[in-house]
Amino acid sequence: MIYNKVPKIFFRADGNEKIGLGHITRSSALASTINSDYDCILATRCKISHVLEAISYIYKHIVQLPETDFHSEATRASDIFENADLIILDGYPFDAGYQQELLKQEFDFFSIDDIHASPFFSRIIINHGGGIRPFDYKARPATQFYLGPSYSLLRKPFLDAAKKRRNKVINKNCFVCFGGADPENKTLEILRSDNIREHFEQFHVVTGSAYIYKEELKRFADSKENIFLYSSLSSEEIVSLMKQCCFAICSPSTIVYEYMSVGGIVFLEQIADNQEHVIKYMTGEGLAFLINDIGNIEENSMKLSLEKQSFYFDGRSDERFRKIFRQHFYGKNMVIRRAENMDLQICFNWANDKAVREQSYNQNPIGFDEHTEWFHQKRNDPDSFFYIIEMDGEPIAQVRFQVSGGEAVLGYLADEKIRNKGLGTAILSKGIEKFVNDYRNPIQIVGYVKNSNYPSQHSFEKLAFVKTKSTKYPDSFKYTMYYDN
């Protein structure tokens, strides 16, 4: 498919007083990153008017959806996502059944996730939670994964702040926020704690438009001189407020990624089951501390925390996302087929390319007669699955799987003209998808990559391979994926 028109991308996310606004916030952050190149449309059941008004500038259009069961919604996908080139799903109701219905209707879709609970059928999975590995998911073998804080879903003011981040503690002001809803009113519980209040000079408290305890919170804040309340702030206003506070108490949700982009000492309190993994990861990595640690953190631990935050939150996640979407739509032009006799010469040229030989285990040049014999043998071998990938009618890569004893050894080569464009994962994904569809049996797929071949390692690691040290080849890694249809 060649895109002569601007691709249309639908974002499917909801928000309300019960589930909060995190799904809409992070989906809108992603949409704002790519909307200069794509027509972004939000399909939502959210009915909070000022929330929709605040994000309306991001989307070309907002589609208001009725309340119905999600299975019924999925069966109407062709009406909801009319002429969609891509759908981004962000929410727990968009489970395996919902996704399978989209597959039936031949939609292409990504998932934004944070709990890796149900099976996924998405082309790409984005999870900025940290500590999650591709093989922790039950997904299609060709699914690509973009995981960890390097892929934080942040709005532009927070990305800009990360490039000028705070690197030392200069006050005892505390930023407090538990998301857009805070249904259990954790905000007020924290502020009422004498043990917490005694450690900070000021509290700057932000609540969202879905927060229903505003009057109760205001009555308490009015009784204290050092508690200041804010509601429904813009992202620019939140950044400004965060810059005034060297400490934060918040939930392990989108807000903590935003605060860590500004930089500061974070104390986390879990308010939802899906936050358990994030809180373990962030405290385990020293990025944040538990709320019970308030008053017990040494200065050196705070310094190390700020340093680690600066490593993960570099303000460049928007660049990474734009690259992912460019590669995805570029890759949709790829066509894969079995190798034919006419591919003999191009495969010979690829095999003798200088860069290819340097990363091969046999680095000697290959003669044409030797190559010809090998090529025809592989084409005629029933255990060899030899594919050519084309783009716009031109061969750009070969992917080959050699099956033996329940194992398929994978190898691939790419034409010089497409190297260094980040297409390695797309090529592998295309090849794996074709192979498992052709083979149709349980199989272990294995690839070997030299320690020095960083681009190829990066390509494998965006798929559900397990990485181990190779015992077959020196100075190499072994990548293993088990497929069970």
Model segments located where?
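A short helix-loop-beta-strand connector motif used in the catalytic cores of GNAT acetyltransferases and
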Residues: F375-I388, A397
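Active-site and donor-binding regions of nucleotide-sugar-utilizing enzymes
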Residues: F11-L21, R26-T33, R45-I58, I62-R140
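Acyl-donor (CoA/ACP) binding surface of acyl/acetyltransferases
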Residues: N333-I346, A351, E390-N485
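Catalytic binding pocket for nucleotide-activated donors in carbohydrate/polymer assembly enzymes
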Residues: V256-S301
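C-terminal alpha-helical cap of glycosyltransferases
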Residues: N300, D314-N333
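A nucleotide-sugar donor-handling region in carbohydrate enzymes
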Residues: F121-N185, E215
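Donor-nucleotide binding loops and adjacent catalytic segments primarily
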Residues: K168-Q244
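Acidic donor-binding loop of glycosyltransferase active sites
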Residues: K243-T254, F267
